[in-house]
């Protein structure tokens, strides 16, 4: 369990401490690389959907993990290396990594 919960515990709020706990869990359990999609900013207001290969997570000493953006992933789109908020990518499939990303995104988007 990512946050040390049992099946009947309520989900805790998103805060710095819980984000670090979730980061440790994902670092130990995700299998990289995996495929995803994300919306890449282009200019001020435009975004385009791009395929993405997720290759890892930035360490807490490489970026700020906060309640606004959460855990930051790293990877490559067809054009360049990119860093992105992990909760903003879309994963498909039933692999354990895909389920972990969807669970994290659900918690991050609904408990902050």
Where on the chain are the PLM-derived regions?
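Basic/aromatic-rich interaction segments and small domains that mediate binding to polyanionic partners
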Residues: 1-27, 31-111
